[in-house]
Amino acid sequence: YFSYNDKIIKILEAEYLNADHHFTSGTVISDKLEIACGSGILRVKKLQQESKKALNIEEFLRGTNILKDTVLK
């Protein structure tokens, strides 16, 4: 899970990409919600905002704009 705009968001489905990068862990590195990890990249596919129904990434991003270079906690 991660926190964004004071809301907890659970990652329900994701894909790990074994790729080198130079970003700080937690940094959003694409507009499709790919997140830099200590080693590799996490491509989020499905998530759930607190008190909301689960959404695939396309549905979620239609209603929530998480900008590239945002550092998630």
Curated annotation (Swiss-Prot):
The keyword Protein biosynthesis applies. Its EC number is 2.1.2.9. It is an enzyme of class 2 (transferase). CDD domains: Met_tRNA_FMT_C. Keywords: Protein biosynthesis, Transferase. GO terms for molecular function: methionyl-tRNA formyltransferase activity. The keyword Transcription does not apply. Attaches a formyl group to the free amino group of methionyl-tRNA(fMet). The formyl group appears to play a dual role in the initiator identity of N-formylmethionyl-tRNA by promoting its recognition by IF2 and preventing the misappropriation of this tRNA by the elongation apparatus. Belongs to the Fmt family. This is Methionyl-tRNA formyltransferase. It comes from Rickettsia parkeri.
